[in-house]
Design a protein with these regions (language model features):
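PLD/PLD-like phosphodiesterase catalytic module centered on the HKD motif
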Residues: 4-147
C-alpha cells in the first residue's frame, strides 16, 4: 500500500493487523514528511503498533510521495483516496480496482523501486524521539478521527 496520508480508521487498522497476524506480508509506504505536520504526527502513532504485529512500514525520503495504490496478489487499486477518515467518509473519491496480473506486477515493481528511496520504520526509532515529539504525536492521534 502506498499513501501520502495514513491516518487509518479502526476497520482499516484491524484489517491490516489481522492480515499481518495471519502471516500475510503487509507493507505500507508513506512519505517521511508530508505537507501536513499534523497528519504526519498522527500517522507516526500508528507505526509502532503495526510494526509490533508484523506490518512493515517504510518512509519515503526522496520527496513528497503522493501515490495512492494498493496491490494484493493480482489485484491492483489506483485512485484518489488517501487512507484516512476524510477520504473514507467526507471527500468524494474514486478508485479503479483492476484484476490484472500485468498491472499489479507493474505497480508492485514501482513499489519495490520506491523502497530503494525509503527507510524502514523500526521500533527503536520511535522510542528515540524526544518527549515533546511523542507528546505532539499523541495529541495529533486524538484528532485523527477529524483528519
Amino acid at each position: 500500500m502506498t499513501t501520502p496520508y495514513f491516518v487509518p480508521n479502526e476497520p482499516l487498522l484491524l484489517a491490516l493487523t489481522t492480515a499481518a497476524l495471519r502471516g500475510v506480508e503487509v507493507q505500507i509506504l508513506v512519505p517521511q514528511r508530508s505537507d501536513s505536520r499534523l497528519v504526519t504526527a498522527a500517522a507516526r502513532t500508528y507505526f509502532e503498533e503495526l510494526v509490533r504485529v508484523g506490518v512493515r512500514v517504510h518512509q519515503y525520503e526522496s520527496s513528497m510521495l503522493h501515490a495512492k495504490t494498493l496491490v494484493v496478489d493480482n489485484l491492483a487499486m489506483v485512485g484518489t483516496a488517501n487512507m484516512d477518515n476524510r477520504s473514507f467518509r467526507l471527500n468524494f473519491e474514486v478508485a479503479a480496482v483492476l484484476l490484472d496480473e500485468g498491472i499489479a506486477g507493474s505497480l508492485a515493481a514501482t513499489f519495490q523501486a520506491d523502497l530503494q528511496h525509503s527507510v524502514e520504520y523500526r521500533l527503536q526509532l520511535g522510542q528515540q524521539n524526544p518527549v515533546w515529539q511523542r507528546l505532539s504525536e499523541a495529541t495529533a492521534r486524538l484528532l485523527s478521527p477529524l483528519l
